[in-house]
């Protein structure tokens, strides 16, 4: 839930107007909108590069997953792994745009551990892949923008552990 929605819901639950503090937080959120959109655009424009480089790093760090018997062994399973990384990158962009972890949590992380466990997919490898994406993505961003995006990558990584 965005800061705007949270503030309105809280104020309405108490049958009151928005407080000066709530209005300041909303103002700050609105003023940061261009920056958040810029970050999301950079990540979106570079998604293929981010996913490809992160996949290469992951497969070098974890050769077990691309070896016979590994979850990403073979062309089809490697493509599935990269597709999953792309999915998590997309979730990160949702979080950046919203300025909130709610889209990441509500759209993509509910039941993820159970799903990967049922498929026999090592969750640690998924987390390592997301961390590799963070490194690639943050190298494309300025320091402040990198910290902003990094927060959402870190949240996603943490949910995998």
Swiss-Prot record:
Record keywords: Antenna complex, Bile pigment, Chloroplast, Chromophore, Electron transport, Membrane, Methylation, Photosynthesis, Phycobilisome, Plastid, Thylakoid, Transport
Binding site for (2R,3E)-phycocyanobilin: 81
Keyword field contains Cytoplasm: no
SUPFAM superfamilies: Globin-like (SSF46458)
Keyword set includes Magnesium: no
Classification via Pfam families: Phycobilisome
Record's signal peptide: none
Record's comment on post-translational modification: Contains one covalently linked phycocyanobilin chromophore.
A single Gene Ontology CC term: phycobilisome
Membrane topology qualifier: Peripheral membrane protein
Modified sites of kind N4-methylasparagine: 71
Listed transmembrane segments: none
InterPro entries hit by this protein: Globin-like_sf (IPR009050), Phycobilisome_asu/bsu (IPR012128), Phycobilisome_asu/bsu_sf (IPR038719)
Biological processes annotated in GO: photosynthesis
Main location, first listed in the record: plastid
Localization terms from the record: Plastid, Chloroplast thylakoid membrane
Further information: Although originally identified as Cyanidium caldarium, these sequences derive from Galdieria sulphuraria.
Subunit structure: Heterodimer of an alpha and a beta chain.
Function: Light-harvesting photosynthetic bile pigment-protein from the phycobiliprotein complex. Allophycocyanin has a maximum absorption at approximately 650 nanometers.
The family this protein is said to belong to: Belongs to the phycobiliprotein family.
Name of this chain's protein: Allophycocyanin alpha chain
Native species: Galdieria sulphuraria (Red alga)
